[in-house]
Amino acid sequence: MDCLFCKIIEGSIPSRTLYEDDIVKVIMDVNPNANGHVLVLPKKHITDFEELDGETIAHIHGVAKDMKKLLYKALNPDGLVLVNNYGITQVIKHYHLHLIPVYKKKQEIIDRNVIYEKIMNVK
């Protein structure tokens, strides 16, 4: 399969992994919209949420909830956007959630390795 996220999940493309279990992998976005922008990727290749069973949806959102708490502790954002893209807005055809912290004060995007270390040091 020629899916970027499947290659990241299998490890043939490196990523900054924040969390991983049998169902999902959470990584830092390589082109972040904000400091702390992360992706929750189901390990099974799924293109649309309609393909997900209720248990998997609940697990993905449970992990997203835990990541939200971690992002708030590590980065102290003023809010968070949770996004799914479908159809024309879905660049990579592998279902995933974006967690994008938002800040009242404009911030420059800093090195994602620095952000990664901040997040990992909270655990």
Task: Enumerate the predicted regions with their spans.
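HIT superfamily nucleotide-processing domains
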Residues: 1-123
